[in-house]
A protein has these predicted regions:
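Oxyanion-hole/transition-state-stabilizing segment in secreted/luminal serine hydrolases
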Residues: 65-79, 93-138, 143, 154, ...
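Catalytic His-Asp segment of secreted/periplasmic serine-dependent ester chemistry enzymes
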Residues: 160-237
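N-terminal secretory targeting modules
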Residues: 1-59, 63-72, 76-77, 146, ...
Length: 237
């Protein structure tokens, strides 16, 4: 995600990164895939059929996308809020951004949007810097704030991945989370780091929670729900 897509406000928010490195040209325009187009069309029809009647928006990748099928019981907790799940497997920040800029936020007025995105930026490209992934997350937050000014955003830390705390990807995830935490304003953007909830006291990510070291199973989704439900209840008031 190139820095040229960030507004001065977002750049100021990420002031801790004095000069974001020039990124590879991973722009929304070059992020489109056949899968994206197909799922995007499905989402647009879903929005039209429901006449935009959704109170809760979920934005993310396969981790978000898989919740309804992998843990129906926990996902059912959102039913009273009429959720719209905009997760797509494998997506990076620039692909999510393309979708949000091309209609998926139009005609809806959710009370809360929960955003968890960025792990595929870090996992799919070994040279992807945390600053680049954070810039993509920042642009997504900015886009939601612009298109849905009355919607509160619950921005989550990128979930831990890989079993051991010493694994290299863990450090990059942590560095990215440290950056996106700066987007918290305590009013319309609430940042919540729930990393510890998934880990043992020693920092291990067990197969009992994420069998492949990335995607939650039913137990992992229960942990996710327990970690965010009180905050969501407050934001939904």
């Amino acid at each position: 995600m190139s820095c040229r897509f960030l507004s001065p406000i977002i750049l100021a928010t990420l002031a801790g990164v004095a000069a974001l490195p020039a990124a590879e040209p991973r722009t929304p325009e070059t992020a489109v895939t056949p899968v994206l187009i197909t799922r995007h069309s499905t989402f647009m029809k879903q929005i039209a059929d429901a006449k935009g009647d959704f109170d809760f928006l979920l934005v993310g990748d396969s981790i978000t996308d898989g919740w309804p099928s992998k843990s129906k019981e926990t996902y059912a907790a959102f039913a009273p809020w009429k959720p719209l799940n905009l997760g797509i497997s494998g997506e990076r920040t620039e692909q999510v951004l393309w979708r949000l800029l091309n209609g998926e936020l139009d005609g809806i007025h959710p009370k809360v949007a929960m955003v968890m995105i960025g792990t595929n930026n870090l996992g799919h490209a070994a040279d992807e810097k945390p600053e680049w992934a954070a810039a993509g997350v920042a642009k997504i937050v900015e886009t939601i704030r612009t298109k849905l000014p009355n919607t509160k955003i619950l921005l989550l830390s990128i979930f831990p991945r890989s079993e051991k705390p010493t694994d290299g990807i863990r450090a990059r995830v942590t560095a990215t989370n440290d950056l996106i935490a700066k987007l918290h304003d305590g009013k319309m953007v609430i940042y919540k780091d729930i990393t510890a909830a998934f880990l043992t006291p020693e920092g291990v990510l067990t197969k009992e929670v994420m069998p492949d070291g990335l995607h939650p199973n039913a137990k992992g989704y229960q942990i996710w729900l327990d970690a965010v439900k009180p905050t969501l209840d407050e934001l939904m008031k």
